[in-house]
Curated annotation (Swiss-Prot):
One of its GO terms (molecular function) is DNA-binding transcription factor activity. The hydrophobic-rich region (HR-A/B) corresponds to the oligomerization domain. AHA motifs are transcriptional activator elements. The gene is HSFA2. A motif (Nuclear localization signal) lies at residues 231-238. Exhibits temperature-dependent phosphorylation. Sumoylated at Lys-315. Sumoylation represses its function. This is Heat stress transcription factor A-2. Residues 17-40 are annotated as: Disordered. It comes from the Eukaryota. A motif (Nuclear export signal) lies at residues 334-341. Residues 17-30 have a biased composition (Low complexity). The keyword Hydrolase does not apply.
Length: 345
């Protein structure tokens, strides 16, 4: 019994000594709180977002960028329908972007959903505690818009740029259509003008053929024209119809001769028109078909068949200059040779 008592006393002494030793140590230094005891952890939103991005199984939908200092949402539709309900109990992608905006995330690439924050880095989850939630976001957004700073856009980001591009393309297409319509209108006007000129040319050619046929069919007209030409040449002493050689220093007499030549040519033109009008009046009084009408009909047939062009392949200058040099006898011979154009017996 005494041995047991001694052992108990030894144990008691030993325990008392340890307590005394611990109390002596505690008295030497003041008590301190545990490190990080009063610090709060990162917000659940940041923790869930970090875990979602860090998960290799979701790399096809959301993952870190090549620099691993930002994350990219590759498929916004699948992100909204699968990941958001799993981590945040909702499927509103715009609400997720608003949450990023409140924690200071910024959009990196305007063409894709890439966001970055200085405290949101791959492999450094402990930096999430440095990301603080912003207050008075409405006032901050106004200040950022006024200073031209970029921020995360809420809603259907990217569609506005696409709409603007489509509007520009639409404006370019409308301008091109207007330009093509103007060109079409101008082309139609040019074609109409060319058709009008062609009709006028054909009409003049037909009138010329008709005039020549009637003139050659009426020997009185040819004889009267030849007599008048001969009389006027003898009266004025001019060789009408022949070309004159121009000198380097024309004299006053030469200029007067040229003036008389022009006046004489105008008179002859008026006389030809008067004779031609008289011939037409005489033929209008005759109801029976004449050789002139037969000639005109034949010439019209030739014009329709296209055979008149080869028969009338004569220069205009020759037609203008030659008749004024003919004598009366030459005209009679020509009319006699063209028996089918002569007057009726």
């Amino acid at each position: 019994m005494e041995e047991l008592k001694v052992e108990m006393e030894e144990e008691t002494v030993t325990f008392t000594g340890s307590v005394a030793a611990s109390s002596s140590v505690g008295s030497s230094s003041s008590p301190r709180p545990m490190e990080g005891l009063n610090e709060t952890g990162p917000p659940p939103f940041l923790t869930k977002t970090y875990e979602m991005v860090e998960d290799p199984a979701t790399d096809t939908v959301v993952s870190w960028s090549n620099g691993r200092n930002s994350f990219v949402v590759w498929d916004s539709h699948k992100f909204s329908t699968t990941l958001l309900p799993r981590y945040f109990k909702h499927s509103n992608f715009s609400s997720f972007i608003r949450q990023l905006n409140t924690y200071g995330f910024r959009k990196i690439d305007p063409d894709r959903w890439e966001f970055a924050n200085e405290g949101f880095l791959a492999g450094q989850k402990h930096l999430l505690k440095n990301i603080k939630r912003r207050r008075n976001m409405g006032l901050q957004n106004v200040n950022q818009q006024g200073s031209g700073m970029s921020c995360v856009e809420v809603g259907q980001y990217g569609f506005d740029g696409e709409v603007e591009r489509l509007k520009r393309d639409h404006g370019v297409l409308v301008a091109e259509v207007v330009r093509l319509r103007q060109q079409q209108h101008s082309s139609k006007s040019q074609v109409a003008a060319m058709e009008q000129r062609l009709l006028v040319t054909e009409k003049r050619q037909q009138q010329m053929m008709t005039f020549l046929a009637k003139a050659l069919n009426n020997p009185n007209f040819v004889q009267q024209f030849a007599v008048m030409s001969k009389e006027k040449k003898s009266l004025f002493g001019l060789d009408v119809g022949r070309k004159r050689r121009l000198t380097s220093t024309p004299s006053l007499g030469t200029m007067e001769e040229n003036l008389l030549h022009d006046q004489e040519f105008d008179r002859m033109k008026d006389d030809m028109e008067m004779l031609f009008a008289a011939a037409i009046d005489d033929e209008a009084n005759n109801s029976m078909p004449t050789k002139e009408e037969q000639c005109l009909e034949a010439m019209n047939v030739m014009m329709r068949d296209g055979n008149l062009e080869a028969a009338l392949d004569v220069k205009v200058e020759d037609l203008v200059g030659s008749p004024l040099d003919w004598d009366s006898q030459d005209l009679h011979d020509m009319v006699d040779q063209m028996g089918f154009l002569g007057s009726e017996p």
